[in-house]
Amino acid sequence: MFDVTLLILLGLAALGFISHNTTVAVSILVLIIVRVTPLSTFFPWIEKQGLSIGIIILTIGVMAPIASGTLPPSTLIHSFLNWKSLVAIAVGVIVSWLGGRGVTLMGSQSQLVAGLLVGTVLGVALFRGVPVGPLIAAGLVSLIVGKQ
């Protein structure tokens, strides 16, 4: 009873540890635990809701400085007066738009998801990236191949 998927996950977790990327390693180890225990019954829910929950947690992390007062309102207001901040705002809008296209593409062309996931894991593990890659990558792919 050789489980190729488990072997792939273990290899990716090892890659995460070797590259000192605990985000990848811990995430994959959690998925391995889910896979080899009765928790595997939750995979359909994780697959359906995981992305939304991840985006919510990411948004909480990004918005926390505003909510805590670490980033004062005056700094936010000044961000509309500085050209570098305006560039950051424009890039944020573009990247968010790409992410939206990416979600649509991932839902409509599931055959691309494996490539996007492998590319993201490699980018996170080898280049110290962060796992927001699949959405942005899918958005970029949608510009090249179309949403269809």
Curated annotation (Swiss-Prot):
Classification of source organism: Bacteria, Pseudomonadati, Pseudomonadota, Gammaproteobacteria, Enterobacterales
Species of origin: Escherichia coli (strain B / REL606)
Main localization (coarse): membrane
Family: Belongs to the UPF0756 family.
Protein name: UPF0756 membrane protein YeaL
Bilayer-crossing regions: 14-34, 51-71, 86-106, 121-141
Alphabetized InterPro entries for the sequence: UPF0756_TM
GO cellular component: plasma membrane
Keyword entries, A-Z: Cell membrane, Membrane, Transmembrane, Transmembrane helix
Domain of life: Bacteria
Mode of membrane association: Multi-pass membrane protein
UniProt subcellular location: Cell membrane
One Pfam family per UniProt: DUF441
